[in-house]
């Protein structure tokens, strides 16, 4: 059986590496991308089991990425993370189809629980 494959789209390299370490130590396979465009041109959308994306990305933002992803894979679980504590932004992510939203700094245990719940 193949591992649960998670794509992470995050422009903060330190957070990206920290998330990679956290998820790999929990047994997940991880793909890393620095922008929504990098992810979309990677041709891995059909392979992943979950997408974790920041909202504040250069170019296409996380909410726009979520909409593009759900246009071809409407049931793919997407977790959105963001720095600003703006309820309207988090609500927009949920309205666009995010399964869960998290505000930075991330609670590692809560993130792992959210991923476990969607497996």
Task: Show the residue positions of the predicted features.
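Two-component/phosphorelay signaling modules centered on CheY-like receiver
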Residues: 12-31
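Acidic, metal-coordinating helix/loop segments flanking the phosphotransfer/catalytic sites
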Residues: 32-50
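Acidic catalytic/metal-coordinating carboxylates
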Residues: 35, 61-64
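The short loop immediately C-terminal to the conserved phospho-acceptor aspartate in CheY-like receiver
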Residues: 55-56
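Short amphipathic alpha-helix used as the core "switch/output" element in two-component signaling
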Residues: 63-75
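Alpha4 helix (beta4-alpha4-beta5 surface) of REC/receiver domains from two-component response regulators
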Residues: 64, 85-100
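C-terminal output helix
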Residues: 88, 106-116
């Amino acid at each position: 059986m193949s591992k649960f494959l998670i794509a992470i789209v995050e422009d903060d390299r330190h957070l990206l590496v920290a998330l990679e370490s956290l998820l790999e130590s929990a047994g997940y396979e991880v793909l890393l991308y620095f922008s929504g465009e990098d992810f979309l041109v990677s041709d891995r959308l059909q392979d992943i089991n979950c997408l974790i994306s920041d909202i504040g990305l250069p170019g296409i933002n996380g909410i726009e990425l979520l909409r593009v992803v759900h246009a071809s894979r409407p049931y793919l679980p997407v977790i959105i993370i963001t720095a600003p504590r703006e309820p309207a932004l988090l609500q927009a992510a949920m309205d666009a189809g995010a399964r869960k939203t998290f505000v930075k700094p991330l609670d590692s245990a809560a993130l792992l629980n959210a991923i476990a719940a969607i497996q």
